[in-house]
Regions:
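Alpha-helical scaffold segments that mediate packing/assembly in large oligomeric complexes
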Residues: 145, 149-164, 168-225
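Short, solvent-exposed loop/turn segments at the edges of secondary structure
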Residues: 140-144, 235, 311
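Short gly/pro-enriched beta-turn/loop segments at secondary-structure junctions
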Residues: 228, 233-237
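Sequence/fold signature of self-assembling virion shell proteins
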Residues: 201-205, 209, 213, 217-224, ...
Length: 338
């Protein structure tokens, strides 16, 4: 029982995951012992079975698959988090019930204005105003890959190749998600009012290369954009999202302007050259949503997977269900000449 309790942490440690408070036995275990324990927990040892045959039987059990998956999940999540750190700072999660297309409705956070009350005045009832949300239906995308651990790997207690694959898939999921975020920004979709998200009329376009003057005008536009209820949004610039070729300039510009404590640079590799976006804090005005399957407990799912019998291996499936969408046209200014 103690071996099984320590097994997932043992796998996680072996593949290089950072494990907080690992089981005391985690470091001393090897894969062969884990596989044999899984076999014996499922069915007692038969008289004719050798150590190797017990190990082989254990590799085919659901228990061994779940152990591999639990250990691999920790590394996949950590590599995903490291790679996704930038785009997750300026996006917000949005739960969807299933994989069917869904419309995202944006409620205007400033749509109902508080009113000054006189003495004994009646408090008026406000009605939430729907913002011009994305009229295009969006949906979750599923990215997945199977990874196996061979009998030789188990015998040799060697998880280097497995570790490299799992870590790579966690990072790959984050890169694919970032690409969807970039496409959501660049798509300039039609909103619910029939007009495109970005246009001069919406006070959210600065069609010039990034420099101090352009940044200043974009900051002013965030302040002066109008909510659907007609209020000045008064939004403070929080994130400067740029294409890779603009990153150094963006960081130098913020440093020279004394804005490094106010505005944070984030880079999206899939943006066209010269592109930049200035966004408000997503807590004040969410603009870009990253889709998640409702009820999912993790951004990356790692599940046991039965490998083809001829491969003589145990396996896991690394899966990411994600998507991205532009939620509203306020709280963002698009810059660049691309």
């Amino acid at each position: 029982a103690e071996i099984l309790a320590a097994a997932a942490d043992s796998v996680a440690v072996a593949i290089g995951a950072r494990v907080k408070n690992p089981h005391p036995l985690a470091v001393g275990l090897n894969l062969q012992t884990i596989a044999q324990t899984c076999a014996l927990a499922t069915q007692p040892r038969r008289e004719w079975e050798t150590e190797m045959s017990v190990m082989g039987r254990g590799m085919n059990t659901d228990l061994f698959g779940k152990t591999l998956a639990a250990g691999a999940r920790q590394l996949a999540l950590q590599t995903y988090d490291a790679q996704a750190a930038e785009h997750l700072t300026f996006t917000v999660p949005f739960d969807v019930k299933n994989f069917n297309p869904v419309e995202i409705v944006a409620a205007d956070a400033q749509g109902v204005a508080l009113e000054l009350l006189g003495e004994n005045a009646e408090v008026a009832t406000g009605v939430a105003i729907l913002d011009a949300g994305n009229a295009t239906e969006v949906r979750l995308h599923t990215f997945a890959k199977n990874v196996g651990v061979s009998r030789r790997d188990v015998v040799n207690d060697d998880l280097q190749l497995f570790s490299a694959f799992v870590a790579g898939l966690g990072g790959s999921a984050a890169r694919l998600e970032a690409e969807l975020v970039a496409k959501a920004l660049e798509g300039n979709p039609l909103m619910d009012d029939g007009a495109q998200a970005f246009a001069e009329a919406h006070n959210n376009v600065e069609a010039v290369a990034l420099d101090a003057e352009a940044l200043g005008r974009a900051m002013a536009k965030l302040r002066n954009q109008r909510t659907p209820s007609g209020q000045l949004a008064g939004l403070r610039a929080r994130f400067l999202v740029v294409a890779p070729d603009v990153e150094f300039l963006a960081r130098q510009l913020l440093k020279d302007s004394g804005l490094t404590d106010v505005v944070t640079v984030a880079v999206l590799a899939n943006l066209p050259e010269g592109r930049w976006y200035l966004l408000a804090d997503p807590l004040a005005c969410p603009v870009v949503a990253v889709l998640r399957l409702a009820g999912s407990t993790s951004r990356i799912l790692v599940e046991p997977h039965k490998m083809p019998i001829h491969t003589d291996s145990a396996g896991v499936r690394v899966r990411c269900d994600t998507g991205a969408a532009l939620v509203r046209r306020q709280g963002i200014v698009r810059g660049g000449t691309a």
